[in-house]
Amino acid sequence: MSRVLSEVLAAVRPVDQSLFPVAKAHLDNLTKPRGSLGRLEELAARLFVIGGGAKPVVDPARIYVCAGDHGVAAEGVSLFPQEVTRQMVANFLAGGAGINVLAATAGIDLRVVDAGCLGDPFAPHPRFAGARVASGTANLAEAPAMTREQCESALLLGVSLAEAAAAEGVRALGTGDMGIANTTPSTALFCAYLGLSPAEITGPGTGLDAGGVGRKAAIVAKGLALHADVVAGGDPVAVLACLGGLEIACLAGLVIGAAACRLPIAVDGFISTAAYVAARAICPTVADYAVVSHASAEPGYAPIMAALGQKPLLDLGLRLGEGTGAALALFLMRSACNIYNDMATFASAGVSEG
C-alpha cells in the first residue's frame, strides 16, 4: 500500500460513542413522545455524534457521480451498449438525468467525475472533474480489472474529492455512479468481501431476462475463480483491483475520504454499496460515517444488507443508481438535523411532559 494511502487510512478515527447518550437525552427532551420520530431520531443522533457533539449540520451537501467503463461489458452482461456511459455523462452535465432533478429538488450540489471512461476527454465544464485514471478496465473474467497502481490511484482520487469538498465547506457527501456493466464487478466484490455466491445475488441490472442473469452469474463466478488466490489472500485493495472498477474504487476512496474528514456520507444503491463494502474492508471505521440510503431493487441486495447487519433508510424500489437514493437520503439527513436543532424542548415551549 502506498505511503499516501496509508496516511489517509491512519487519519480515519472512530466516532466518540459516549456522545450517543447525550444525543438521546436531548431528543427525549423535545416536544414529542420519546422515540416517536423513529429512525429520524436515530439518524439525528448519528449525525450529532459524527460531528463530535456540535449541532448536526449537513448543508451544504454534495453528491459526486463517478463514471467509468468496464472491460467485462464485452461479455454481454448489460442490455445497454458501452457508449451509454459517455452519453449519460453528457446528460448529467446538461442537467437532464434523474439525479439532476432530485439533487436540484433537494438543494444538493452535483459534481460529475470521469474516473475511467473510454474515448476522448470530455469538454471542460464547471461541475466536471476530468480525472481519468485509465480508459476503462480490463475484463475481470480474463485478467485483473485494474493494476494495483491504477486501483490505488482511483482510491486516492476519491479521497481528494472528499478533501476538496471539505475544504470548500461542504458538510455532507453522497455517492453516485455511472458505468455500463458495473453491476457485474459490484456483484463480484460482494461475493469476494462478504462470502456470498453469484447465484444468490446476481440480478438483472438494467433489465436482463432470466437467461441473461444466469450468464452474468457465470461470468461473475468465472472472475472469482480466476482471482481466487487473491480473494483468499485477504488483501482488500488487491481484491478491488482484480474485481472492481475505476469508478467503484473512486467511490470507495470518497467514502474513506469522507470519514477522514469527519463528514457523513450517504451511500447510494447497488454499485455505491459495493464501493462502501470495499472501503469498509480496507478501513472498517468508515462504517461510523456512512448512511446506507436505500434498499436497491436488485434481488441480491437483501442478503448483502443481512451480511452487513445494516438497514437502509428507504425502500422505494429504486434501481437507477446515479446517486438518486443518496439525494433522497441527504434530504432526510437534513430533516433529522433540523429536528435536533430546531424543535422546542418541553421547558422552552411550556409543554408538560408525559
From Swiss-Prot:
Keywords: Cobalamin biosynthesis, Glycosyltransferase, Transferase
EC identifiers of the protein: 2.4.2.21
GO biological process: one example: cobalamin biosynthetic process
Pathway: Nucleoside biosynthesis; alpha-ribazole biosynthesis; alpha-ribazole from 5,6-dimethylbenzimidazole: step 1/2
InterPro entries hit by this protein: Nict_dMeBzImd_PRibTrfase, Nict_dMeBzImd_PRibTrfase_bact, Nict_dMeBzImd_PRibTrfase_N, Nict_dMeBzImd_PRibTrfase_sf
Listed PANTHER family: NICOTINATE-NUCLEOTIDE--DIMETHYLBENZIMIDAZOLE PHOSPHORIBOSYLTRANSFERASE
Family: Belongs to the CobT family.
Name of the protein: Nicotinate-nucleotide--dimethylbenzimidazole phosphoribosyltransferase
Organism field: Solidesulfovibrio magneticus (strain ATCC 700980 / DSM 13731 / RS-1) (Desulfovibrio magneticus)
Lineage, top ranks: Bacteria, Pseudomonadati, Thermodesulfobacteriota, Desulfovibrionia, Desulfovibrionales
